[in-house]
Amino acid sequence: MHGRPAGSVMTVEFELDGQKFVALNGGPHFKFNEAVSFQVHCETQEEIDYFWTRLTDGGAEGPCGWLKDKYGLSWQIVPTALAELLLDPDAKKSQRVTKAFLQMKKFDLAALRRAYQGQNP
């Protein structure tokens, strides 16, 4: 029906955190890229570490909380506090946070909070 070898999969349905998805097998002609990514919002450093460790296993770390899993799919592992730190009306605080996270691969929540407060790492 889909012109692929018998037994191959054309679509897969899955659910993440209550959100339903359908993935289409585009074959070798369509590769994953950063235009499509999943964001995982984490409350704690432990959650950041958990998802980072598991998703980079067989994959690759990227800058600023980005990574690719072993299938080449892009993910962003983001502390929920980041928005609050970046949207502070005090521009100096948000600039320090931005400067700090631009140097990170995996987000370090304690380091972001120190930057926000103007404390040295």
Show which residues each predicted segment covers.
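Glyoxalase I/VOC metalloenzyme domain signal
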Residues: 1-121
